[in-house]
Curated annotation (Swiss-Prot):
Entry EC no(s): 3.5.4.2
One GO-annotated biological process of the protein: adenine catabolic process
Family to which the UniProt record says this protein belongs: Belongs to the metallo-dependent hydrolases superfamily. Adenine deaminase family.
Pfam families recorded: Adenine_deam_C, Amidohydro_1
One GO MF term: adenine deaminase activity
Cofactor: Mn(2+)
Species classification: Bacteria, Bacillati, Bacillota, Bacilli, Bacillales
Protein name: Adenine deaminase
Gene coding for it: ade
Hydrolase is among the record's keywords: yes
CDD domains: AdeC (cd01295)
Key word Thylakoid present: no
Length: 573
């Protein structure tokens, strides 16, 4: 804040000058005392300068509505929306999200520093408050075949940027425990810069929680049970309750929250597809869900705003009080979280704002990122010994974790998908350098009866991942993604059914939100032609089957990976 702005705000606060904007006739939520106030809100230069009776150049009549702090998404990968930051903003602001803390490790895994710089530049083109955590694990594990590597020296210069809040989810727990030099340097650099460090403690024991806390890690969003949540809070951590497209943990973890410990909990979406953001919402959905599950509404709203702000040191976010930014929501129904207006930095979001994103032009260096070797159906064969059982990845709907099981395959020298037993073939294909590296395995739980689906969104290294009922359609889906520069596709009968092109790093569209949303709806409608009828997002579920830091069993370009043993294993024991 410059001196002139400081003086203007003091003048308005002290009544020596009129405030720029005054909101009257509203019920103000006091997140500190958990009570309602009936008074004016004075705003100048985008900040709240006073509560009380004020005169202003611009008067907003709240008409008896409730005024609450804007919502904060504590951990989100914007790339999972498949649109650029300005288009993402258009999806979440109407749902009351005024601030997000994002980890751009998806695009960084494909394009490294260039991808990180692209996201920082795009974030400046929107009114949404976008803060960044620097990707800590690119790639997610040392054996991963990502498109880039980010070491401590690559990240260090970014800490001088005001919008960078710290080091993003530290996933490589083996490197942390072993004190691997570059990981140690990343942790030390974040600490020296006075920044926060996010964790990623999926399925880890209390002993590992101790290790992470000793390393300075402050948060975890991978909690799936109340017991895990309390374990982390006891050790001084913040816990994020997550509700994304693939992982829906809010209901399961919420019983851990009470009046004594609530300040250590807040909400995040992590990964949520665009169509679900538009239709269902973001943090607003979690606040409403928490209230429906019996949490005190004041505490739910506090978790959606102030708690995240305090965790990340955002001193001017998360409350309706003097000294805080005028990021406000007008609410007509408190428990149903019915938002009528969203204000960011003192200006009402009209819904007609045009994106300033330069889309494909700005991303010119991130295009044409899908490089595939020549593949044939025999490259997809999995040799088996008929008498032996095979290892199977069992998916858990709406969770990121999987289970390792055994199953009896059909007779033959090679694995054949068994539709009656829902045993399908899964493939991870290297797509960054065009080398022929293909990991093959068997998965159960998708319920496809025909065809195949594939995507270049494949956490976190973002190679190409496909699942299908036959090799012909799997190969067709793979080839189609190469032709369109990445994205999502469905193949059946050797032909393309529907695709969504994501030419920016194989992760993002260069099209407006509305166009991408319609394409996604068409994609989800088309997948029913494969016989899919599951109550989960098949593409997002598929994309997380390649993340080898979430238990129990995942896939890489080298094949099946046992996360707990931290090693690759063959399809047949």
């Amino acid at each position: 804040m410059d001196k002139e702005m400081f003086i203007r705000r003091l003048g308005a606060a002290s009544h020596r000058k009129k405030a720029e904007t005054v909101i009257k006739n509203g019920k103000i939520m006091d997140v500190f005392n958990q009570e309602w106030l009936e008074t004016d809100i004075a705003i100048t230069d985008g900040a709240i300068v006073g509560l009380g009776e004020y005169e202003g150049g611009n008067i907003i009549d709240a008409e008896g509505q409730m005024i609450v702090p804007g919502f904060i998404d504590g951990h989100v990968h914007i790339e999972s929306s498949m649109v650029t930051p300005p288009e993402f903003a258009k999806a979440v602001i109407p749902h009351g999200v005024t601030t997000v803390v994002t980890d751009p490790h998806e695009i960084a895994n494909v394009s490294g520093v260039k991808g990180l710089e692209f996201m920082l530049e795009q974030a400046e083109m929107t009114r949404l408050n976008i803060y960044f955590m620097l990707p800590s694990c690119v790639p997610a594990a040392p054996f991963e075949k990502s498109g880039a590597i980010l070491n401590a020296a690559d990240l260090h210069p970014f800490y001088s940027r005001e919008e960078v809040l710290g080091l993003a989810e530290v996933m490589d727990y083996v490197a942390v425990e072993a004190g691997e030099p570059d990981m140690v340097q990343k942790l030390i650099d974040a600490d020296k810069a006075g920044k926060r460090i996010d964790g990623h403690l999926a399925g880890l024991s209390a002993g590992f929680v101790n290790v992470y806390r000793a390393a300075g890690v402050l948060t975890d969003h991978e909690v799936t049970t109340p017991e895990e949540a309390l374990e982390r809070v006891r050790r001084g951590m913040y816990v994020m309750l997550r509700e994304g497209s693939a992982a829906k943990n809010t209901r399961h973890v919420l019983p851990a929250v009470n009046e004594k410990n609530v300040r250590r909990f807040f909400f995040c979406t992590d990964d949520k597809h665009l169509d679900e953001l538009v239709d269902e919402g973001s943090i607003n959905y979690q606040v409403k869900l928490a209230i429906q599950e019996g949490l005190d509404p004041f505490l739910a709203y506090q978790m959606g705003s102030l708690n995240a702000a305090e965790c990340f040191g955002l001193k001017t976010k998360g409350a309706v009080a003097p000294g805080y930014d005028a990021d406000l929501l007008f609410i007509s129904d408190f428990e149903n979280v019915s938002i009528t207006k969203t204000m960011i930095n003192g200006v009402i979001w009209s819904g007609t704002e045009q994106s300033q994103s330069t889309g494909g032009k700005a991303a010119s260096g991130l295009l044409q990122s899908v490089h595939l070797s020549d593949l044939h159906e025999n490259d997809l064969q999995i040799p088996i010994v008929q008498e032996n059982e095979i290892r199977v990845i069992d998916i858990i709907p709406n969770q990121l974790e999987t289970k390792l099981s055994l199953a009896k395959p059909k007779s033959g020298a090679f694995f054949q998908p068994d539709l009656e037993s829902d045993l399908l073939k899964i493939a991870v294909v290297e797509r960054h350098r065009g080398v022929k590296e293909i990991g093959l395995g068997v998965v159960r739980g998708f319920g496809l009866k025909e065809g195949a689906i594939a995507t270049t969104i494949s956490h976190d290294s973002h190679n190409l991942i496909a699942v299908g009922t036959n090799d012909q359609d799997i190969l067709k889906a793979i080839e189609r993604l190469g032709e369109i520069g990445g994205g999502l596709t469905i193949a059946k009968g050797g032909k393309e059914l529907q695709s969504v092109a994501l030419p920016i790093a194989g992760l993002l569209s260069d099209k407006p939100l509305e166009t991408v949303n319609e394409s996604l709806k068409s994609l989800h409608a088309a997948i029913t032609e494969t016989g899919f009828s599951g109550a989960f997002n098949p593409f997002l579920t598929l994309s997380f089957l390649a993340l080898p830091v979430i238990p129990d069993i995942k896939m890489t370009t080298e094949g099946l990976f046992d996360v707990k043993a931290f090693r690759h294993i063959p399809v047949q024991p």
